[in-house]
């Protein structure tokens, strides 16, 4: 089980920023943005540092793979747990990362919900009509380009239930690319499947690990066919990378 020291450190790290942002968001969006930026730039790396110190939990970010990235790009990735969000914030800490996600994340999740709203991530209502969802993504994409942010989308649409890469759905990705015209970085992450629930998080945290890597960068797709081809190839690339990581122990990079 998670140690008292680890839990105490995490709680002491989270509470001031979480409470501060809850209080700030309704009265001052600028202050909430400042707190949210602190959460992303300072607390996300500190979160993994605490886990490594007290639970021997490793964060393996393959930074050499980022050398192929252009200045501006879109990320498509597999999706394993809610921790995927701080994982990408930590991995791309030199960038301004913005996620396409369900709007449930923007409510009642300490540290996360106000941050996602203040930073204007793309929060899509679960019951949104397809056309409305596309409008959300289109506006989000244009805003990301204008502010030189990196949009991140999980084409599976939901977290994996078995650790395997699920079907990649194309509609959201196509709209995002139509509104941004950015190169596409295919990224793989692994380690979240064993931490996808609160119970499994506490049970599997010790000597676990998270891995994230850029696999390939595509030129901006110009058609529906090119978008579909990227998604098909990306799914295979990611699954192959997960298979390659599978034999490694948590302390092996």
Go through the PLM ranges and name each one.
Residues 1-42, 65-69, 143, 192, ...:
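Membrane-interfacial terminal anchoring regions of lipid-handling membrane enzymes
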Residues 111-113, 150, 161-225:
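A cross-family acyltransferase "interaction/gating" segment
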Residues 25-26, 30, 69-128:
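Catalytic core of membrane glycerolipid acyltransferases/transacylases, capturing the structured
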């Amino acid at each position: 089980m998670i140690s008292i020291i680890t839990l105490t450190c995490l709680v002491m790290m989270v509470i001031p920023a979480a409470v501060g942002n809850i209080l700030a968001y309704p009265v001052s969006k600028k202050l909430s943005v400042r707190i949210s930026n602190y959460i992303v730039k300072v607390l996300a790396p500190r979160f993994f540092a605490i886990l490594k110190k007290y639970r021997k939990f490793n964060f393996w970010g393959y930074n050499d793979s980022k050398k192929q990235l252009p200045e501006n790009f879109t990320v498509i990735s597999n999706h394993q747990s809610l921790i995927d969000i701080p994982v990408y914030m930590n991995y791309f800490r030199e960038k301004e990362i913005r996620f396409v996600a369900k709007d449930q994340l923007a409510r009642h999740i300490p540290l996360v919900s106000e941050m996602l709203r203040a930073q204007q991530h793309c929060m899509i209502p679960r019951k949104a009509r397809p056309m409305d969802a596309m409008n959300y993504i289109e506006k989000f994409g244009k805003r990301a380009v204008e502010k030189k942010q990196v949009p991140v989308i999980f084409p599976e649409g939901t977290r994996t239930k078995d650790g395997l890469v699920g079907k990649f759905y194309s509609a959201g990705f196509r709209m995002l690319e139509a509104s941004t015209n950015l190169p596409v970085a295919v990224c793989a992450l692994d380690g979240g499947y064993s931490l996808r629930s609160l119970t499994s998080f506490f049970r599997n945290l010790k000597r676990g690990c998270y891995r994230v890597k850029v696999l390939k960068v595509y030129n901006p797709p110009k058609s529906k066919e090119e978008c579909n081809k990227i998604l098909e190839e990306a799914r295979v690339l990611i699954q192959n990378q997960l298979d390659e990581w599978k034999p490694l122990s948590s302390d092996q990079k």
